[in-house]
Amino acid sequence: MLIEERLLTLFKRNCQHTLTYWSVFFSFGLSIAFLGPTILDLKCRTGSTLQEITWVFFAQQLCLLIGSSSGGAFTKTLFSALLALFLSSLIISVVFSIIPLCYNVLLLAIAMAVSGLAMGIIDTIANIQLVSIYKKDSPIFLQALHFFIGLGALLSPLIAEPFISGHCLRSNSTENATEIIHHFRSSFRSPVNLPESSPLSGPVEERNVSYAFWIMALINLPVPIAVFVLMYQEKLLPFCPNSSPRLLDKDELAMETKAPDNTEMAELDDEVFLHSGHGNIFSCCTDGALRGLPVTFFLIHIFGGMVLFMTEGIMGVYAGFVYTYAVSPPMSLQSKMAGNLNCIFWAAITAGRLVSIPLSYRFKTVHLLLTNMAGVIVTLLLLMILYTNRVFLFVGTTFLGLFISSVFPCLVAYTEDILEYRGCATTVLVTLSGMGEMTLQVLAGTLIQKKGSYSFLVCGLVIGCLGFIFLLSVILSNHFHRKITGASKKAEITDGPAAPAPEKTAPEHKTAVIQPECIKCDFGLDHNGSKPAENT
């Protein structure tokens, strides 16, 4: 059997929760990818300059980082987590619908910032909730979760494509387009993809990109509805009749019938998980949460976060600057052909996450991480060596997307497993990955402008090597962490008092004495065991 029966049973038990969290990540992917293809239309609609429109997207990335770092605060209860997901996914649909009405760059910046905040909250909550449900079995479900990002990211430009107009260009359109693409990682094709036969001064077919945003708003609308239905099923809506029992109540009843002792332990683990720092990133730094923890606990958080800082940075840098690299010497590809590189990259990421679902079940997470990081470095190295080979640029883009696709979900599952699902790993990792995505793009863009397009590959290779070093540091920290925590657990077992054992057996002894008395009474015997004299 491809997947063992235990995992299928676990998935069936949490099916509605899991599908809901996957659907909100579809919203996340839908929001990530629509910016690139529509950038020139938004620039023309708002009448803004390149510098002004750049700040619009910077506002979205900054608020995405804020939402990621604070989203864990909503995971204290199931109600707050689902309510935050419902509002965030609904906000994304609202933002999609009002973007065509933003004829001012300030209004557009505010709309993008609100959208980024909602995306960050979705990112953190969905990861934490899945880890809390599946724990050691979470890698396969996290891979599927991040597959839905790629699915939404692929669908978004396909919707926008028929409605994009390219007539709002000036004579220096090539220079402007080159500058524009320097700032955005989410472009799936070139924003200056104009037919060569149509002059800029001639009549151009009028297209309304507003329809693209409204269609995406409608496509995203079932997501908040799905979250609302889950809240209803969980009896979390006070104004709705509670006709059916909660889904979790059914599971707890079934588990109670089969193994009450295991249920108590599971409830205890869930309680520990919810109150062990999986909140916002600042709640992880309180004195009570950090007291008595070994130094390896902090090193795992730091090194794991730096791995994602680098890998998510590579994704942002490559998706944002591969077009610029392709149209510049020595590649000098046509803009239409170069614009396909972004779509190939994101398609490879989506396919890689889909393939990683069975792989994460068959292989250890740490082995997948080492293979993926080594593949990223080798691919970037070959791209540097074969920097004039146009065919390998497309092949290398595909392999880079495949290798880097599953690093994020694998590392989240690996670090949470190291910390026994009692740390702040998910919140810290999501926050640092957002910081890397935003920071390294600016750094790489500056180097490309100063040193030329070839520095794009050099920058990617250096970042990849640093990420591999940090991954080895995580593995080494895990080795020492298990030694330290294993020694402390052995000491607790050795020094622990054995007094509670007799107390546990006392009630059993008591019931053993009472039961014969009850039986004797049923047979009409007195307390001394003799029949009462009836005929005397």
From Swiss-Prot:
Keyword vocabulary terms for this entry: Membrane, Transmembrane, Transmembrane helix
Cysteine pairings via disulfide bonds: none
Any one Gene Ontology cellular component term annotated for this protein: membrane
Superkingdom to which the source organism belongs: Eukaryota
Membrane topology, from the record: Multi-pass membrane protein
InterPro entries: MFS_trans_sf
Subcellular location: Membrane
Family, per entry: Belongs to the major facilitator superfamily.
Name by which UniProt lists this protein: Major facilitator superfamily domain-containing protein 4B
Species whose genome carries this gene: Danio rerio
